[in-house]
Each structure stands twice: as C-alpha cells, then as structure tokens.
Amino acid sequence: MAFPGCPYIQEKRQYLKEIIMSARMNNPATILPDASDGIQTMLKAVYKGGVPRKTLELVHLRASQINGCSFCVDSGARSAKKAGETDERLFAVAAWRETPYFTDAERAALALAEAVTRLADRSDPVPDEIWEEATRHYDEKGLAAIILMITITNLFNRVNITVRQPAGEATW
C-alpha cells in the first residue's frame, strides 16, 4: 500500500469507496417499468438487425469506454465474451485503429460509435467519410441496428453514471 499514513490518500480512498460501492438510487428504468420494457424491446430489435452480435458488443464497449461508465464497460466486456469475443480483441478495443485485430466492417462500426458518442467534439459530429465507410459495410437495416445500439448504450451510460451504479451489479 503506497503512502499508508497520508491523510489525503486515506480520505480520497474513503470517498472513492463510498461513491463506488453503492448506487445513489435504484436504476430508474426499474422504478418506471414501462421504460425498461421499451428499452428491452429496442434491444431485441437491434439484435435482429443483421449485424453480428460481437460487432454490436464491441460498439457498446467502445461507447462505454469513451463515456467512462464502469458498469457498462464491465458488463459490455462480459457480454462480448459470452458472444464469443476474444481477450485479445477486447483488450484492443480502445486502440482499435492501431491494431490488426478488427475487420473493415468492425472498424466502420467503431468509428461510427465514436462519432455518435462524441457529438460535441466537432461541428460536423458524424462526418461524411465516417458515414460513407459505414454504408459500404452495412445496409440500412444494419446501420439502424448499429445506430440504435450506440444510442441505447449512451442512454445506459448516462443513467448508470448519474446514479453511480457500481460495476458488477446487474440492474438492467
């Protein structure tokens, strides 16, 4: 343990323990069950959209990494593993541009996920080149599935970050 006697470190650890170990409230979608039902219906449609499950899980994981949602990064990695994703690729998602592990179609989906998640970062949030690359790999139904996965993920991220949902606790 580094700096065991340092009051600042001890205070910071206690603060982190308090905010990380318990949520501020129950998941709002469980408080308003109709909301949860609607989200689950959308997710079912996304998974029927013709995009490989592993690709959708990578999109979810990347958006969650960008937003800093520990709950969604944890659950996203677990879901990707269940879908057959490898550790090698999971470890490389944050650096997908610099690794050889992803197909061109997956790269297009990841680029779209980053653009849609970072809407405020530029005046043209989803540039034509990102959109056109995505349309080279996915038909309209596939694009719809990817876009909805990105937006649902951003919804999950914002809910879980707001209520400080701890990683590892199932709430959805």
Task: Name each model-derived stretch.
Residues 2-172:
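Hydrophobic alpha-helical segments
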